[in-house]
Amino acid sequence: MRVKKRNVRGNAKNFITRSQAVRKLQISLADFRRLCIFKGIYPREPKNKKKANKGSTAPTTFYYAKDIQYLMHEPVLAKFREHKTFARKLTRALGRGEVSSAKKLEENRSTYKLDHIIKERYPSFPDAVRDIDDALNMLFLFANLPATNQISSRVIRDAQVICNQWLAYVAKERLIRKVFVSIKGIYYQANVKGEEVRWVIPFKFPENIPSDIDFRIMMTFLEFYSTLLHFVLFKLYTDSGLVYPPKIDVEQDKILSGINAYILESQEETSVLNAEVPSDAPDKEAQSIDTKTLAQAMKADSKDKDDNSNDEAPENVEDVELDEFEDHNKNKGDILAQPSKFSSPTATLFEDFVFYVGREVPIEAIEFLILSCGGKVISEAAMDQIEGNTEFDLSKVTHQIVDRPVLKHKVAGRTYIQPQWVFDCINKGELLSANLYLPGVSLPPHLSPWGDALGYDPTKEVESEDESSDSSEESDSEIENEEEDTKPAAITNEDDDEDVEELAAQKELELEASGIAYSKAKDEGLHDDVASKKKRKVTDEDEEEKKLKMIMMSNKQRKLYKKMKYSNQQKEDKIEELKKKKKQLAKKEKTLKKVEKK
């Protein structure tokens, strides 16, 4: 009999511990973490940890052995090893006091790029767009952090540039769909190339950075995400015919830095401008033109001049307008109406409006949303920094956004609103009444456009007292009928027919006693009773089927099913409680209105 070797198959072969992986790759633990983040490799959980760890029960981190084998052929791994030798040589040179050799080493240090990793992980562009949610969240987080010993100002500045380029593109293409102001920040959702992208921008408050955060891991993620976003933005800008990276208006950036400072130019305009600008240094190919070719070009130029002189000789010739003929036989039904550039209703929501934003309103969020919906913005904070205010025409202002309770002076012809009006209009996809958002008025609740975790919809209207009483009576009658009906769930067709006949006879007697013709009310009352009877039968059959399925479940599945039922019941109870509170509030409001009328 052949002896079976232990720990050579199954979990022991498929999984490898982290310490074994580090020894196999011959790099430090920090470099191993960076490499795993770049390549998208994360720890795995084997079914049997004891077998995977070759009999040991010590807590360890496992990876797939094939993933580690895949990392061994990574070009970035060689760059990490080169950097390790560079650091060793640099410390040796500095220790000896050889400053010149240290400078040479610093100038010739090896660098790596993540371009090939981006192409490997995201073979198609929709895959990259689908995965930029986390990238945007990380970059907007770093863009709002202060510079510290662990985070350099260059990193924060680069993150701010990428974030502003993203916002400028979304505003230019009018891709915003939903927005929600929460405690954490402002959530945005945009439709980019058919993919829903959602990200959060934190509020610009002074941040207290905790001391227990590992910024090395976060900086590694930031490095990868910034490279990914550069790829995505380049593709988005070029597909839209825009120049990437966009130019920055220095004067506008000094006044009020934001997406208004970015100039989005089309590639056609820049190509025309480059063609018009004469080149100072002629090309080498242009210098080596043959004399024969030059003579042919001079002859062609002379011919063109003669033709132009002949064409320009008759000066007083009247312009003759040619008749235009229409083809009436052409089938106009074949011509399809082309859709507009902005198909979403939110894209043209504020197209005819000019907003004057007060200095107390956060300009970054409001400006981005208004520009994304086609509106124009005039900021009071920007006007304060410009002397003379000659660039702004305030006569075209239609709406003024105010976030203060009382206004001393009001301009006729303007609609005064609070900032929440902009958010709610975008979520609804239509212009809401401005009377609900006047300055100093208590605002309606700002609800999440993505719904509640419980599934409760507070926008639904409260049922009236008559409807609620009718529904309660119906439920009571159903409960009574269920209590009376003590028959088992498996009812035969013969029993159903007998029950229907008994119901019909009883209904006929009741109608004769009340003086109503049975033939008139037969189709109304009898069918309702039969339908309710059949409905109860279906519910009983469903309950019986659920019981049979639970019997066939394993103990683990049964426990999981009970937990799910318990959590769902808790959600339903919470929803019912909220509905009751809403009904009570509606009743109080009605009574108060009645008292005020009296």
From Swiss-Prot:
Statement: the UniProt record of this protein carries the keyword Lipid metabolism: no
Natural source organism: Candida glabrata (strain ATCC 2001 / BCRC 20586 / JCM 3761 / NBRC 0622 / NRRL Y-65 / CBS 138) (Yeast)
Function comment: Component of the NOP7 complex, which is required for maturation of the 25S and 5.8S ribosomal RNAs and formation of the 60S ribosome.
Source organism phylogeny: Eukaryota, Fungi, Dikarya, Ascomycota, Saccharomycotina
One Gene Ontology term from the biological process aspect of the record: maturation of LSU-rRNA from tricistronic rRNA transcript (SSU-rRNA, 5.8S rRNA, LSU-rRNA)
Coiled coil segments of this chain: 557-598
Subcellular location: Nucleus, Nucleolus; Nucleus, Nucleoplasm
GO molecular function per UniProt: large ribosomal subunit rRNA binding; ribonucleoprotein complex binding
Primary localization class, coarse: nucleus
Pfam families: BRCT_2, Pescadillo_N
Recorded GO CC terms: nucleoplasm; PeBoW complex; preribosome, large subunit precursor
UniProt protein name: Pescadillo homolog
Chain positions covered by the region annotation Disordered: 296-317, 452-501, 515-544, 564-598
Listed Basic and acidic residues bias regions: 520-532, 570-579, 586-598
Family the UniProt entry places it in: Belongs to the pescadillo family.
Domain BRCT as annotated: residue spans: 345-439
Keyword annotations from UniProtKB, A to Z: Coiled coil, Nucleus, Ribosome biogenesis, rRNA processing
UniProt biased composition (Acidic residues): 463-485
Quaternary structure note: Component of the NOP7 complex, composed of ERB1, NOP7 and YTM1. The complex is held together by ERB1, which interacts with NOP7 via its N-terminal domain and with YTM1 via a high-affinity interaction between the seven-bladed beta-propeller domains of the 2 proteins. The NOP7 complex associates with the 66S pre-ribosome.
PROSITE patterns tied to this protein: BRCT (PS50172)
